[in-house]
Amino acid sequence: MDVYQMVTERIIEQLEKGYIPWKKPWANCLDGTFNRISRKPYSLLNQMLLRHEGEYATFKQWHQIGGQVKKGEKAEMIVFWKLQDVEEKSDGDERIVKKVPILRYYNVFHISQVENVLPLEKTEEFDTKPIEKAEEVLNNYIEREKITLFVGASDRAFYRPADDSITLPGITQFESAEEFYSTAFHECGHSTLKAYRCDREADNAKAYFGNEDYSKEELVAEMTSASILHSLGIETPDTFINSAAYIQSWLKVLKNDKRFIVSAAGKAEKVVKYILNVE
Protein backbone atom coordinates (compact mmCIF):
# COMPACT_ATOMS: atom_id res chain seq x y z
CA MET A 1 0.00 0.00 0.00
CA ASP A 2 1.54 3.38 -1.00
CA VAL A 3 1.46 6.55 1.08
CA TYR A 4 -1.46 8.07 -0.86
CA GLN A 5 -3.70 5.03 -0.44
CA MET A 6 -2.72 4.78 3.23
CA VAL A 7 -3.59 8.42 3.96
CA THR A 8 -6.84 8.14 1.99
CA GLU A 9 -8.00 5.04 3.83
CA ARG A 10 -7.10 6.47 7.24
CA ILE A 11 -8.99 9.70 6.53
CA ILE A 12 -12.08 7.81 5.36
CA GLU A 13 -11.87 5.62 8.46
CA GLN A 14 -11.66 8.76 10.64
CA LEU A 15 -14.65 10.34 8.89
CA GLU A 16 -16.76 7.25 9.50
CA LYS A 17 -16.41 7.86 13.24
CA GLY A 18 -18.68 10.90 12.94
CA TYR A 19 -18.41 14.68 13.19
CA ILE A 20 -14.95 16.16 13.79
CA PRO A 21 -14.69 19.89 14.58
CA TRP A 22 -12.01 21.78 12.63
CA LYS A 23 -9.73 24.11 14.60
CA LYS A 24 -7.94 27.03 13.02
CA PRO A 25 -4.31 26.06 13.71
CA TRP A 26 -2.92 29.57 14.22
CA ALA A 27 -3.52 32.22 16.87
CA ASN A 28 -5.36 35.40 15.95
CA CYS A 29 -3.35 38.44 14.97
CA LEU A 30 -4.82 41.72 16.12
CA ASP A 31 -3.47 44.20 13.62
CA GLY A 32 -4.75 47.27 11.82
CA THR A 33 -8.02 48.85 12.97
CA PHE A 34 -10.49 46.55 14.70
CA ASN A 35 -13.40 46.42 17.13
CA ARG A 36 -12.29 45.70 20.69
CA ILE A 37 -15.27 43.48 21.51
CA SER A 38 -15.66 41.39 18.33
CA ARG A 39 -11.91 41.62 17.53
CA LYS A 40 -12.88 41.81 13.86
CA PRO A 41 -11.18 44.30 11.53
CA TYR A 42 -13.24 47.20 10.24
CA SER A 43 -14.07 47.43 6.53
CA LEU A 44 -11.63 49.20 4.22
CA LEU A 45 -13.95 52.23 4.08
CA ASN A 46 -14.12 52.47 7.87
CA GLN A 47 -10.36 52.05 8.17
CA MET A 48 -10.04 55.10 5.92
CA LEU A 49 -12.53 57.04 8.07
CA LEU A 50 -10.80 56.27 11.38
CA ARG A 51 -7.75 58.34 12.32
CA HIS A 52 -5.75 55.74 14.26
CA GLU A 53 -4.81 52.09 14.07
CA GLY A 54 -5.77 49.80 16.92
CA GLU A 55 -8.84 49.22 19.08
CA TYR A 56 -12.14 51.05 18.73
CA ALA A 57 -15.55 50.50 20.35
CA THR A 58 -18.76 52.37 21.03
CA PHE A 59 -19.28 54.26 24.30
CA LYS A 60 -21.54 51.43 25.51
CA GLN A 61 -19.07 48.70 24.51
CA TRP A 62 -16.22 50.37 26.43
CA HIS A 63 -18.50 50.75 29.45
CA GLN A 64 -19.39 47.02 29.30
CA ILE A 65 -15.74 46.04 29.87
CA GLY A 66 -15.11 48.60 32.60
CA GLY A 67 -13.77 51.41 30.44
CA GLN A 68 -14.64 55.07 30.81
CA VAL A 69 -14.40 57.49 27.88
CA LYS A 70 -12.40 60.53 29.02
CA LYS A 71 -14.32 63.75 29.48
CA GLY A 72 -14.32 65.97 26.40
CA GLU A 73 -13.21 63.25 23.95
CA LYS A 74 -14.83 63.42 20.51
CA ALA A 75 -16.17 60.31 18.80
CA GLU A 76 -15.27 59.16 15.31
CA MET A 77 -17.79 57.77 12.86
CA ILE A 78 -17.99 54.37 11.19
CA VAL A 79 -20.66 53.44 8.64
CA PHE A 80 -22.51 50.27 7.73
CA TRP A 81 -25.32 49.20 5.43
CA LYS A 82 -28.60 48.03 6.91
CA LEU A 83 -31.35 46.40 4.84
CA GLN A 84 -34.71 48.08 5.38
CA ASP A 85 -38.13 46.97 4.12
CA VAL A 86 -39.66 49.55 1.78
CA GLU A 87 -43.16 49.23 0.35
CA GLU A 88 -43.74 50.07 -3.29
CA LYS A 89 -46.97 50.16 -5.28
CA SER A 90 -47.24 47.98 -8.35
CA ASP A 91 -49.40 48.79 -11.39
CA GLY A 92 -52.32 46.85 -9.94
CA ASP A 93 -52.32 48.59 -6.55
CA GLU A 94 -50.59 45.57 -5.07
CA ARG A 95 -48.00 46.52 -2.46
CA ILE A 96 -44.55 45.04 -2.99
CA VAL A 97 -42.01 44.98 -0.17
CA LYS A 98 -38.40 45.41 -1.24
CA LYS A 99 -35.27 45.36 0.85
CA VAL A 100 -33.30 48.55 0.30
CA PRO A 101 -29.80 49.15 1.71
CA ILE A 102 -29.71 52.20 3.99
CA LEU A 103 -26.44 53.74 5.13
CA ARG A 104 -26.21 53.99 8.93
CA TYR A 105 -23.43 55.02 11.29
CA TYR A 106 -22.04 54.42 14.77
CA ASN A 107 -19.91 56.68 16.93
CA VAL A 108 -16.78 54.97 18.23
CA PHE A 109 -13.84 55.89 20.45
CA HIS A 110 -10.20 54.84 20.17
CA ILE A 111 -8.61 53.08 23.15
CA SER A 112 -6.35 56.12 23.70
CA GLN A 113 -9.53 58.05 24.58
CA VAL A 114 -10.55 55.53 27.25
CA GLU A 115 -9.47 55.03 30.87
CA ASN A 116 -9.29 51.81 32.94
CA VAL A 117 -8.75 49.49 29.95
CA LEU A 118 -5.44 47.99 28.83
CA PRO A 119 -4.80 47.27 25.12
CA LEU A 120 -4.98 43.68 23.94
CA GLU A 121 -1.83 41.80 23.05
CA LYS A 122 -1.40 42.12 19.29
CA THR A 123 -0.61 38.47 18.66
CA GLU A 124 -0.43 35.40 20.83
CA GLU A 125 2.99 33.93 20.13
CA PHE A 126 4.49 30.50 20.72
CA ASP A 127 8.12 29.43 20.87
CA THR A 128 7.73 27.45 17.65
CA LYS A 129 10.88 26.50 15.76
CA PRO A 130 11.16 25.45 12.09
CA ILE A 131 11.55 21.77 11.16
CA GLU A 132 14.62 21.55 8.95
CA LYS A 133 13.45 18.91 6.46
CA ALA A 134 10.02 20.54 6.04
CA GLU A 135 11.61 23.97 5.66
CA GLU A 136 13.90 22.58 2.97
CA VAL A 137 10.97 21.12 0.99
CA LEU A 138 8.99 24.36 1.29
CA ASN A 139 11.86 26.64 0.32
CA ASN A 140 13.00 24.41 -2.56
CA TYR A 141 9.50 24.45 -4.04
CA ILE A 142 9.00 28.20 -3.59
CA GLU A 143 12.41 29.03 -5.11
CA ARG A 144 12.11 26.54 -7.97
CA GLU A 145 8.68 27.83 -8.98
CA LYS A 146 9.52 31.50 -8.30
CA ILE A 147 6.41 31.86 -6.12
CA THR A 148 6.26 34.98 -3.93
CA LEU A 149 5.95 33.93 -0.27
CA PHE A 150 4.75 36.30 2.46
CA VAL A 151 5.15 35.00 6.03
CA GLY A 152 4.26 37.27 8.93
CA ALA A 153 1.59 38.39 11.39
CA SER A 154 -1.69 37.56 9.67
CA ASP A 155 -5.12 36.11 10.31
CA ARG A 156 -5.28 34.45 6.90
CA ALA A 157 -3.51 31.81 4.85
CA PHE A 158 -4.15 31.84 1.11
CA TYR A 159 -2.78 31.39 -2.41
CA ARG A 160 -3.44 34.23 -4.88
CA PRO A 161 -3.31 33.00 -8.50
CA ALA A 162 -3.28 36.54 -9.94
CA ASP A 163 0.26 37.22 -8.74
CA ASP A 164 1.29 33.64 -7.94
CA SER A 165 1.80 34.38 -4.24
CA ILE A 166 1.26 32.55 -0.96
CA THR A 167 0.50 34.36 2.31
CA LEU A 168 0.97 32.56 5.64
CA PRO A 169 0.72 33.56 9.31
CA GLY A 170 4.10 33.58 11.06
CA ILE A 171 5.34 30.26 12.44
CA THR A 172 5.19 31.59 16.02
CA GLN A 173 1.41 32.02 15.65
CA PHE A 174 1.22 28.21 15.49
CA GLU A 175 1.42 26.13 18.65
CA SER A 176 3.28 23.46 16.69
CA ALA A 177 5.59 23.66 13.68
CA GLU A 178 3.76 20.68 12.15
CA GLU A 179 0.57 22.77 11.95
CA PHE A 180 2.50 25.57 10.23
CA TYR A 181 3.81 23.21 7.55
CA SER A 182 0.40 21.58 7.21
CA THR A 183 -0.99 25.03 6.35
CA ALA A 184 1.97 25.91 4.13
CA PHE A 185 1.76 22.71 2.07
CA HIS A 186 -2.02 23.15 1.73
CA GLU A 187 -1.43 26.52 0.05
CA CYS A 188 1.41 25.05 -2.03
CA GLY A 189 -1.14 22.47 -3.17
CA HIS A 190 -3.41 25.25 -4.42
CA SER A 191 -0.50 26.86 -6.27
CA THR A 192 -0.13 23.79 -8.49
CA LEU A 193 -3.48 24.43 -10.19
CA LYS A 194 -1.62 26.63 -12.70
CA ALA A 195 -1.57 25.22 -16.24
CA TYR A 196 2.25 25.08 -16.28
CA ARG A 197 2.30 23.06 -13.04
CA CYS A 198 -0.37 20.38 -12.49
CA ASP A 199 -3.01 22.07 -14.66
CA ARG A 200 -6.28 22.18 -12.71
CA GLU A 201 -7.23 25.62 -14.06
CA ALA A 202 -10.03 24.21 -16.21
CA ASP A 203 -11.42 22.35 -13.17
CA ASN A 204 -11.48 25.62 -11.23
CA ALA A 205 -12.63 28.00 -13.98
CA LYS A 206 -16.12 28.21 -12.45
CA ALA A 207 -15.11 27.75 -8.83
CA TYR A 208 -16.33 30.21 -6.23
CA PHE A 209 -16.36 29.98 -2.46
CA GLY A 210 -18.60 27.15 -1.27
CA ASN A 211 -19.56 25.57 -4.59
CA GLU A 212 -18.71 22.02 -5.72
CA ASP A 213 -15.65 22.92 -7.80
CA TYR A 214 -14.22 25.00 -4.95
CA SER A 215 -14.84 22.14 -2.50
CA LYS A 216 -13.09 19.62 -4.75
CA GLU A 217 -10.02 21.87 -4.96
CA GLU A 218 -9.96 22.18 -1.16
CA LEU A 219 -9.96 18.37 -0.90
CA VAL A 220 -6.99 18.16 -3.29
CA ALA A 221 -5.03 20.78 -1.33
CA GLU A 222 -5.68 19.16 2.04
CA MET A 223 -4.91 15.64 0.77
CA THR A 224 -1.66 17.09 -0.59
CA SER A 225 -0.78 18.58 2.78
CA ALA A 226 -1.62 15.40 4.72
CA SER A 227 0.40 13.25 2.30
CA ILE A 228 3.50 15.47 2.45
CA LEU A 229 3.46 15.56 6.25
CA HIS A 230 3.09 11.78 6.33
CA SER A 231 5.91 11.22 3.82
CA LEU A 232 8.24 13.55 5.78
CA GLY A 233 7.43 11.75 9.02
CA ILE A 234 6.15 14.91 10.73
CA GLU A 235 2.46 14.06 10.86
CA THR A 236 1.04 14.27 14.39
CA PRO A 237 -2.34 13.11 15.75
CA ASP A 238 -3.42 16.77 15.84
CA THR A 239 -2.47 17.52 12.23
CA PHE A 240 -4.11 14.33 11.00
CA ILE A 241 -7.37 14.89 12.91
CA ASN A 242 -7.51 18.52 11.77
CA SER A 243 -6.94 17.49 8.14
CA ALA A 244 -9.77 14.97 8.42
CA ALA A 245 -12.00 17.64 9.98
CA TYR A 246 -11.19 20.11 7.20
CA ILE A 247 -11.92 17.50 4.54
CA GLN A 248 -15.16 16.61 6.28
CA SER A 249 -16.30 20.25 6.27
CA TRP A 250 -15.89 20.51 2.48
CA LEU A 251 -17.25 17.04 1.85
CA LYS A 252 -20.64 18.24 3.12
CA VAL A 253 -20.97 20.35 -0.04
CA LEU A 254 -20.39 17.16 -2.02
CA LYS A 255 -23.22 15.33 -0.21
CA ASN A 256 -20.71 13.44 1.96
CA ASP A 257 -19.75 11.25 -1.01
CA LYS A 258 -16.43 9.72 0.04
CA ARG A 259 -15.61 8.84 -3.57
CA PHE A 260 -14.55 12.47 -3.93
CA ILE A 261 -11.77 11.80 -1.40
CA VAL A 262 -10.41 8.99 -3.57
CA SER A 263 -10.63 11.25 -6.63
CA ALA A 264 -8.88 14.08 -4.76
CA ALA A 265 -6.19 11.67 -3.56
CA GLY A 266 -5.41 10.74 -7.16
CA LYS A 267 -4.87 14.39 -8.05
CA ALA A 268 -3.00 15.00 -4.80
CA GLU A 269 -0.51 12.23 -5.66
CA LYS A 270 0.45 14.14 -8.81
CA VAL A 271 0.68 17.38 -6.80
CA VAL A 272 2.87 15.88 -4.06
CA LYS A 273 5.31 14.47 -6.60
CA TYR A 274 5.44 17.87 -8.30
CA ILE A 275 6.11 19.74 -5.05
CA LEU A 276 8.72 17.20 -3.88
CA ASN A 277 10.20 17.12 -7.41
CA VAL A 278 10.14 13.32 -7.64
CA GLU A 279 8.87 10.94 -10.31
Regions found by a protein language model. Name each.
Residues M1-E279:
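N-terminal accessory/interface modules of nucleic-acid-binding and processing proteins
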